[in-house]
């Protein structure tokens, strides 16, 4: 009995423009997976589309069809074994031919395919595998033109994209280029076997007291002959040590066992405990020979989405292992427009950055792709909760029978693939499709519960989100929460702040509110909000080649910002708050200050509301990352270089964070008058599960002199409420008694150490003289590649930002420094002889 074997078909490929019939048209492909844009670059037929205006010169690639070909030899095949040609992903309209005969046609990028080629490979020797990738943009347009009755309402990109099951951002988005890829975007291989384990999954029951857990494991077997003589040997282990073992026979090609685990190690999100991962393994055996084995990492945990009526409306927050978790985190877009270029190492670095930023949840956005296994593995291992959108975004999708069939296959395949990951806590039907329904005035009668009726309306996609997808999740992953859309709340208008989740874009988009009042604009769970900022100069210098183009309004910089009206919006928020500048380096920094302040005001206020009966259950900023070097809402750029906002968010999400703020006075209104008094508030937010005692101080320091304008307030033995908010005090600033501008500087000590700081500044910054701060940055110790810097100032300093240098990490940045409160920053990665990191602060 031959064991399972597989042969990757990753090398030996060539490709060409499908229309070019000349023999010299064929070009070598370095490695598969790949897409045509990558392979054209490798053959010097295409300039890097991420530099300058090269994206425009690459547009021709989008309109072409491409053919890939390889020659391989038939592998050794034992009697009774089959040969399967397995494709994990074809982008998108693919016709696969083996020795000239069509063996597969695919039109869904998000599906895997398995083709039995045993008979086709009966002959020994060489065999030719050829794949034609038809132009997706052309096919999309043709499909749209065939259905003139459908309302193709959408945001972003060509509405025809909705006819095709392909990453929607490939049609261009307001943060990315228009690069429509084609190719073998995931692994292709030959598998040879008489029997194999085709699926392994578990169902976990955790007792309410967490003292026991029941792990039911299931293995599905693909075999050509009877499975009566096979057995499945299951092993459950933790950190390499056996927990339980059991052998099972197969019934209807499925084997299952149940393990009772005592004192289970639970999987927790980062900051709440260890993300313990068990390994479930199964070995398929016949006549004491191992035929095939599979193993997966799983977690023992419960995950609930709590939606209950309360005085604010209806709650929306996550409860993990019985603990309410404020989900501070980010939205995720694909990390590259050329998806096969993203390595497992790069995925892990992104998730490591999230953990370093104290972020708990990542939302996989519905206009990209179901991510690579290594993405979810990193989330599992590092304790990051995943909000997983299905791949529908910003549109009214058609529901032709053949499209619904493809979508159902897509959902089945991906939920099967992903369901063992403990990090995934919610599946969500779409991104902003209900907002498209609202804006286009499409029919949505929430009280009509007949799915067949939905298909007859001008919003037929409701059938996908409220019937098809939840049915798949219920069948394949019944313990995972399903939510119809983002944003969505019980069929109400998507801007309703009392129910469901909310995309709050009235800062930046919409009414362009002041970011200082961001916290008043939120809902029960703020799953999108953002503010643009330029990336660091090192990133700009990558895509801006000419020195003459290095000024804020240059054509190439505009070209690399795809957001509608970006210049007006950036300018508005800059001139309202800061003294503007025309040199690029300062301008870049100023946009970053605005982004950092915006994120701070939002997160800080919404986390405070967590303590008000879970008024706000979480905040996922738009967006964590970029898909190319650009100017966008990302808080970390394409090259994994954090912007100042990354650090501002990390501080607000500390296990214990202190907050201080005075009421916002809007100087931009007609006939604005200086306020006679201003109220202020001081509070502590904690995600710890037990009460903590601390000492809190509030100082009132002159911006101009650095001296106290009134006596500090000190409170000892403050009891800090666990997993909530502790309101410390409210006060009033008398502007007649203290007329000079001053900051409110709060510090919190726990166990004798400063654990949190916050500084509230007079607004707007443009009215303040922030020159001559008396800032000093001194190296106080050095050990190996680690340095400690002590930062002090004679006058309050706003937003001290350290240079982001590749391979170097700073423990904090975008810091406010006040007199009498020196702060220490750890720099890791500097070698002997390296220049010290540069830094910049507001008013420098």
From Swiss-Prot:
Belongs to the glycosyl hydrolase 2 family. Beta-mannosidase B subfamily. It is an enzyme of class 3 (hydrolase). This is Beta-mannosidase B. Gene3D superfamilies: Galactose-binding domain-like, Glycosidases, Immunoglobulins. GO terms for molecular function: beta-mannosidase activity. In contrast to clade A beta-mannosidases, which are likely secreted, clade B proteins appear to be intracellular. The gene is mndB. Keywords: Carbohydrate metabolism, Glycosidase, Hydrolase, Polysaccharide degradation. Exoglycosidase that cleaves the single beta-linked mannose residue from the non-reducing end of beta-mannosidic oligosaccharides of various complexity and length. Prefers mannobiose over mannotriose and has no activity against polymeric mannan. Is also severely restricted by galactosyl substitutions at the +1 subsite. InterPro entries: Beta-gal/glucu_dom_sf, Beta-mannosidase-like_N2, Beta-mannosidase_GH2, Galactose-bd-like_sf, Glyco_hydro_2_Ig-like, Glycoside_hydrolase_SF, Ig-like_fold, Mannosidase_ig. The active site is at residue 432. It comes from Aspergillus oryzae (strain ATCC 42149 / RIB 40).
């Amino acid at each position: 009995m031959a064991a399972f074997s597989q042969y990757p078909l990753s090398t030996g490929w060539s490709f060409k423009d499908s229309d070019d019939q000349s023999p010299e048209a064929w070009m070598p492909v370095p490695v598969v997976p790949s897409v045509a844009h990558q392979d054209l670059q490798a053959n010097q037929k295409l300039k890097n589309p991420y530099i300058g205006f090269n994206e425009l010169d690459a547009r021709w690639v989008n309109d072409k069809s491409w053919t890939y070909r390889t020659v391989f030899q038939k592998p050794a095949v034992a009697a009774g074994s089959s040969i399967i040609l397995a494709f994990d992903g074809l982008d998108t309209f693919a016709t696969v031919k083996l020795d000239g005969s069509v063996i597969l046609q695919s039109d869904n990028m998000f599906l895997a395919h398995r083709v039995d080629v045993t008979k086709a490979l009966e002959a020994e020797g060489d065999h030719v595998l050829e794949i034609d990738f038809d132009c997706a943009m052309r096919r999309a347009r043709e499909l749209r033109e065939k259905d003139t009755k459908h309302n193709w309402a959408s945001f972003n990109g060509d509405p025809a994209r909705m006819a095709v099951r392909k990453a929607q951002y490939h049609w261009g988005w307001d943060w990315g280029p228009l690069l429509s890829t084609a190719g073998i975007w995931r692994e292709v291989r030959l598998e040879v076997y008489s029997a194999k384990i085709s699926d392994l999954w578990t169902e976990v029951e955790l007792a309410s007291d967490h003292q026991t857990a029941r792990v039911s494991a299931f293995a599905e077997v693909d075999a050509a002959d009877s499975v009566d003589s096979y057995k499945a040997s299951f092993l459950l282990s933790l950190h390499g040590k056996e927990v339980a073992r059991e052998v099972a026979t197969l019934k209807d090609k499925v084997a299952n066992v149940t393990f009772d685990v005592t004192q289970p190690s639970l999987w927790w999100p980062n900051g709440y405990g260890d993300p313990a991962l068990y390994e479930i393994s199964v070995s398929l055996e016949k006549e004491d020979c191992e035929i095939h084995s599979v193993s997966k990492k799983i977690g023992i945990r419960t995950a609930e989405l709590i939606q209950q009526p309360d005085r604010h409306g209806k709650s929306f927050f996550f409860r993990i292992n019985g603990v309410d978790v404020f989900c501070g985190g980010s939205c995720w877009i694909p990390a590259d427009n050329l998806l096969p270029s993203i390595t497992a190492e790069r995925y892990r670095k992104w998730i490591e950055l999230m953990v370093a930023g104290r972020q708990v949840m990542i939302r996989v956005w519905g206009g990209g792709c179901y991510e690579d296994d290594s993405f979810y593995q990193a989330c599992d291992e590092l304790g990051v909760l995943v909000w997983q959108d299905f791949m529908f975004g910003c549109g009214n999708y058609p529901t032709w029978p053949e499209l619904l069939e493809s979508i159902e296959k897509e959902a089945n395949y991906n939920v099967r693939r992903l369901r063992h990951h403990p990090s995934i806590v919610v599946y969500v039907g779409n991104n902003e499709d209900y907002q498209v329904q609202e804006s286009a005035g499409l029919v949505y009668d929430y009280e009509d519960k007949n799915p067949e009726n939905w298909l007859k309306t001008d919003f037929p996609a409701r059938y996908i989100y409220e019937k098809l997808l939840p049915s798949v999740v219920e069948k394949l992953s019944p313990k995972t929460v399903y939510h119809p859309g983002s944003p969505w709340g019980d069929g109400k208008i998507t801007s309703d702040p009392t129910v469901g989740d909310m995309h709050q874009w009235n800062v930046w988009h919409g009414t362009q509110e002041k970011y200082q009042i961001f916290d008043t604009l939120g809902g029960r769970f703020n799953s999108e909000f953002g503010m643009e900022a330029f990336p660091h100069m090192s990133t700009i210098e990558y895509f801006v080649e000419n020195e003459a183009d290095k000024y804020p309004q240059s054509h190439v910089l505009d070209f690399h910002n795809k957001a509608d009206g970006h210049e007006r919006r950036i300018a508005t928020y800059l001139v309202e708050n800061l003294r503007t500048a025309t040199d690029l380096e300062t301008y870049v920094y100023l946009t970053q200050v605005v982004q950092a302040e915006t994120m701070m005001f939002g997160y800080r206020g919404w986390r405070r509301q967590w303590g008000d009966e879970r008024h706000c259950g979480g905040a996922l900023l738009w967006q964590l990352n970029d898909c190319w070097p650009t100017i966008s809402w990302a808080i970390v750029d394409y090259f994994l270089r954090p912007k100042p906002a990354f650090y501002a968010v990390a501080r607000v999400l500390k296990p214990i964070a202190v907050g201080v703020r005075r009421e916002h006075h809007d100087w931009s209104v007609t006939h604005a008058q200086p306020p006679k008094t201003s109220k202020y508030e001081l509070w502590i937010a904690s995600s710890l599960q037990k009460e903590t005692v601390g000492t809190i101080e509030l100082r009132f320091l002159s911006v101009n002199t650095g001296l106290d304008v009134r006596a500090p307030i000190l409170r000892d033995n403050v009891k800090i409420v666990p997993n909530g908010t502790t309101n410390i005090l409210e006060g009033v600033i008398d502007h007649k008694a203290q007329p000079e501008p001053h900051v409110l500087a709060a510090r919190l000590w726990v166990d004798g150490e400063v654990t949190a700081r916050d500084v509230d500044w007079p607004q707007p910054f443009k009215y303040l003289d922030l020159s001559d701060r008396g800032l000093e940055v001194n190296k106080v110790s050095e050990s190996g590649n680690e340095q400690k810097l002590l930062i002090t100032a004679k006058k309050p300093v706003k937003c001290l930002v350290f240079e982001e240098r590749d391979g170097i990490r700073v423990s904090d940045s975008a810091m406010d420094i006040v007199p009498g409160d020196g702060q220490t920053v750890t720099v890791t990665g500097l070698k002997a002889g390296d220049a010290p990191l540069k830094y910049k602060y507001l008013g420098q």
